[in-house]
């Protein structure tokens, strides 16, 4: 029985032997395609090839593409764990022809692979074709010898594929496997086709038409092939099981989950183990491709997946975080096919652990609230949207997690009510990932590229070059010429200007034409490898002009230093913090460097000092930087660090900086990078971290300066220290101790002042007699307006007044500071059933023009912007007490 890994290899090797380029899986985050949340099909990385926007590097290709369907239009999340074939992560095996072979060869390849290499019984296979695609039906008869009853014609769009309202499209032919008559279900096209007997295992798409805007379909001059076979589905067939979760990969993951939880994967507990196994896979691969859990966009989808699995771990009784302990099993199963899993294993484990620890803090309380809210509901009942929103807002329960939690009891959630609460509160904003495709300008650049070819970048060796204007784009449209005063995008045949990529800002400078210098304010990449200059024209410019392009050399020098320093920081973070650190982003320009990385908490002063010391030690080595061109896989196997989610071409530039501080003969930093860098580490001169902060859950950011900017920063810091020393009349070395003493003295004085205010407040104040409480409809009330007493002091004053109410009562205080009012209400225990401090405080705040108050039945506080209405607030409380 072949393993999942063996099946994948057999597929790729078959097509590799048939002159297909074996293409590694693209990252799950789509490259240069904002219209997609995640890669969700095997053809996505080839989208621009099929549309004609890019030239295919090979006429034939094959791949096993990582895919995620857990958000947006394609969302399988709710079904995962409860069905035999739904997954959030799956692998799509595919073979592709870009204008090379067509239907006959595609069908021949499919039939040969399935019946010869996969050894599937021929009598177990049947196919569907689009009802008008007689050509495909005839080919199935000719090649496979299928009878008419095993070639089913389908008239619906299930067997006609299109990319959108316009673009390439064509009929499909789907191949089905018959599990046997002991499984319920009918063949495709029959009334009971949704049964599990006949399972689709391969879809062949014949792209032979182009859909025009007016509704017409025209034949493509070079039709193409796009096929997709779910690896998990074909593995189930070949391993003789009917359920994807019974294949070898999932059996190993579920066995590990069973071992760690001590709960068998049977009965009501089986879906939980399946959810954990599936979600571990999608979470780990998303983390490996650079996605981090957050509250918006892709990061929020990842967090939803992780938390759904973590709730199921909670249901299994796992007392400690579980997911991170399962990750090594996944890496052992899939790390050979996907080396990025192995490279990111430490980071995956750490992120899973941190996220589960954070969620477990609120998970138990949230489940308690959910149990309480659903206690009176039976099957068919509906959980109100307000409670679902509270679970989301307060306890971090995504809506689908709440829906999943109540589904076993037959309870649904009022999603409309949830949406109303979400809209009202507006506490979170999720990015709208639905896009409309490429802009007209971007499409124009693809057309220009077909005529011009890629830009010849010579900026590694020089900052000035002569070039020819190949294209000018004004307001998104190509033009032949432009006049002074226009802001245009200019393409040259060769340039020394670096275009923004890899976190390095685009170069600025000047372009000289006809003796006039025009300012270049930015340089960006278009259509993959066109270096486009944003130019503020000071004179006329036309296509074909010869120009001199000069980079701002001073800015390029500092940018180089900052970029090289970022590489050294990356290496230093690994040494100081550990191998879990992964780069999450960077921005380097002529002013400073910013580096984002995965780590669970703030850096200590000692860690920051050690990072600075390492980087400056490598700078002082003053050894030459080394660059080398090689294939991406060769570079990674040689130890170069590749950035997750970065798209690399057939050849990459490998940068080596410095010598190891601990191992003789080893380099300090080796990374794949196409940016501009220093010639020697000593050119960086000096490195200084100026800030360190968190920017997202599990992501920290370092900002730093190099060279002259770092020197000026240190001089400024020294100047501040000297000024303080002069002010305190003490040596610089003793300034910190002097400041600590002053801070301690101030805190002591503040405590004394607060106590004095409290004692003064207890002696009187407007709004009531200082001698004791007043009677309001039988309730004792102490009401005061206290000038100069803030919220912190009010609590202590309220507690003291409360002690005076020996027979029960209410304390209502309004503190006035800086024209604003702070309201504090305290209710004795014997009256909380009758009066709520929270309700009384809210009434006072609203009467004073505020929004509301927070607290409990015995104590509450709130604030209002207008202190002149303090008495109105107390009057509102009196009215509430009087009923």
From Swiss-Prot:
Catalysis performed (reactions): tRNA(Ala) + L-alanine + ATP = L-alanyl-tRNA(Ala) + AMP + diphosphate
Subcellular location: Cytoplasm
InterPro entries: aa-tRNA-synth_II/BPL/LPL (IPR045864), Ala-tRNA-lgiase_IIc (IPR002318), Ala-tRNA-ligase_IIc_anticod-bd (IPR018162), Ala-tRNA-synth_IIc_core (IPR018165), Ala-tRNA-synth_IIc_N (IPR018164), Ala-tRNA_ligase (IPR050058), Ala_tRNA_ligase_euk/bac (IPR023033), DHHA1_dom (IPR003156)
Cofactor(s), by name: Zn(2+)
One GO biological process term: negative regulation of DNA-templated transcription
Protein residues bound to Zn(2+): 563, 567, 673, 677
NCBIfam families, sorted: alaS
Statement: the UniProt record of this protein carries the keyword Transferase: no
Protein name: Alanine--tRNA ligase
Organism, as annotated: Caulobacter sp. (strain K31)
Family classification: Belongs to the class-II aminoacyl-tRNA synthetase family.
Free-text remark on how the cofactor is bound: Binds 1 zinc ion per subunit.
Chain's role: Catalyzes the attachment of alanine to tRNA(Ala) in a two-step reaction: alanine is first activated by ATP to form Ala-AMP and then transferred to the acceptor end of tRNA(Ala). Also edits incorrectly charged Ser-tRNA(Ala) and Gly-tRNA(Ala) via its editing domain.
GO cellular component assignments: cytosol
């Amino acid at each position: 029985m072949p393993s999942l890994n063996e099946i994948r290899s057999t597929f790729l090797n078959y097509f590799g032997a048939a002159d297909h380029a074996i293409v590694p899986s693209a990252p799950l985050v789509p490259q240069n395609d904002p219209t997609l949340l995640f890669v969700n099909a095997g053809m996505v990385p080839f989208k621009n090839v099929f549309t004609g926007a890019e030239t295919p590097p090979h006429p034939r290709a094959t791949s096993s593409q990582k895919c995620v369907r857990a958000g947006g239009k394609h969302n399988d999340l709710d079904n995962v764990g409860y069905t035999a074939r739904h997954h959030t992560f799956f692998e799509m095996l595919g073979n592709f022809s870009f204008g090379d072979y067509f239907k006959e060869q595609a069908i021949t390849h499919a039939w040969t692979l399935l019946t010869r290499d996969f050894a599937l019984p021929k009598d177990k296979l049947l196919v569907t074709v689009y009802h008008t695609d007689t050509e495909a039906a005839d080919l199935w008869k000719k090649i496979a010898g299928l009878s008419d009853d095993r070639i089913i014609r389908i008239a619906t769009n299930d067997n006609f594929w299109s990319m959108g309202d316009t673009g390439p499209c064509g009929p499909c032919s789907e191949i089905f496997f018959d599990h046997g008559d002991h499984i319920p279900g009918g063949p495709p096209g029959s009334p009971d086709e949704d049964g599990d007997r006949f399972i689709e295992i391969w879809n062949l798409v014949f792209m032979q038409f182009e859909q025009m805007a007016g509704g017409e379909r025209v034949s493509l001059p070079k039709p193409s092939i796009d096929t997709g076979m779910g690896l998990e589905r074909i593995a189930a067939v070949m391993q003789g099981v009917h359920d994807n979760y019974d294949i070898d990969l999932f059996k190993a993951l579920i066995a590990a989950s069973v071992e760690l939880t001590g709960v068998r994967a049977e009965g009501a507990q089986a879906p939980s183990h399946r959810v954990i196994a599936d979600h571990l896979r999608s979470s780990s691969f998303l983390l490996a491709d650079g996605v981090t859990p957050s509250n918006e966009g892709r990061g929020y989808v990842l967090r939803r997946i992780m938390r759904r699995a973590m709730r199921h771990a909670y249901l299994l009784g796992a007392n400690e975080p579980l997911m991170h302990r399962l990750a090594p099993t996944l890496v052992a199963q899939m790390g050979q096919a996907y080396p990025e899993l192995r490279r990111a294993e430490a980071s995956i484990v750490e992120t899973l652990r941190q996220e589960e620890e954070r969620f477990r803090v609120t998970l138990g309380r949230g489940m308690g609230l959910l149990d309480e809210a659903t206690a009176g509901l039976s099957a068919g009942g509906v959980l109100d949207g307000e409670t679902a929103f509270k679970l989301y807002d307060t306890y971090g329960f995504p809506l689908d997690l709440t829906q999943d939690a109540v589904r076993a009891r037959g309870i649904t959630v009022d999603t409309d009510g949830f949406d109303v609460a979400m809209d009202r509160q507006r506490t979170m904003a999720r990015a709208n990932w639905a896009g409309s495709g490429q802009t007209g300008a971007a499409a124009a650049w693809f057309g220009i590229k077909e005529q011009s070819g890629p830009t010849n970048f010579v900026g590694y060796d020089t900052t000035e070059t002569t070039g020819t204007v190949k294209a000018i784009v004004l307001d998104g449209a190509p033009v032949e010429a432009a006049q002074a005063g226009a802001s245009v995008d200019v393409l040259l045949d060769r340039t020394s200007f670096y275009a923004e990529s890899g976190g390095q800002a685009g170069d600025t400078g000047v372009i000289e034409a006809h003796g006039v210098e025009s300012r270049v304010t930015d340089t960006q990449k278009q259509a993959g490898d066109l270096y486009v200059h944003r130019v503020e024209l000071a004179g006329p410019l036309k296509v074909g002009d010869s120009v001199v392009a000069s980079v701002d050399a001073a800015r390029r020098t500092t940018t180089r230093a900052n970029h090289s320093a970022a590489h050294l920081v990356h290496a230093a973070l690994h040494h100081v913090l550990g191998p879990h650190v992964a780069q999450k982003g960077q921005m380097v320009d002529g002013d400073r460097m910013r580096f984002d990385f995965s780590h669970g908490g703030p850096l200590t002063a000692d860690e920051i000092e050690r990072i600075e010391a390492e980087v400056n030690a490598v700078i002082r080595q003053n050894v030459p930087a080394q660059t080398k061109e090689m294939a991406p896989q060769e570079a990674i196997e040689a130890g170069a660090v590749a950035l997750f989610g970065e798209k690399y071409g057939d050849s990459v530039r490998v940068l080596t900086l410095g010598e190891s501080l601990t191992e003789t003969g080893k380099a300090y930093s080796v990374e794949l990078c196409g940016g501009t860098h220093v010639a020697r580490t000593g050119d960086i001169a000096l490195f200084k971290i100026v800030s360190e902060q968190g920017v997202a859950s599990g992501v920290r950011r370092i900002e730093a300066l190099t060279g002259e900017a770092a020197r000026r920063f240190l001089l400024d810091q020294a100047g501040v220290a000297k000024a303080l020393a002069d002010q305190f009349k003490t040596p610089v070395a003793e300034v910190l101790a002097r400041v600590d003493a002053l801070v301690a003295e101030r805190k002591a004085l503040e405590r004394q002042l607060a106590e004095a205010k409290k004692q003064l407040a207890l002696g009187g104040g407007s709004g009531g007699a200082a001698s004791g409480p007043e009677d309001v409809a039988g309730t004792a009330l102490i009401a005061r307006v206290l000038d100069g007493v803030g919220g912190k002091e009010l609590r202590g004053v309220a507690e003291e007044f409360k002690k005076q109410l020996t027979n029960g009562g209410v304390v209502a205080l309004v503190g006035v500071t800086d024209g604003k009012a702070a309201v504090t209400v305290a209710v004795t225990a014997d009256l909380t059933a009758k009066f709520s401090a929270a309700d009384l405080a809210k009434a006072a705040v609203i009467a004073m023009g505020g929004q509301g108050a927070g607290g409990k039945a015995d104590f509450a506080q709130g604030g209002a912007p207008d202190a002149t209405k303090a008495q109105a607030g107390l009057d509102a409380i009196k009215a509430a007490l009087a009923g």
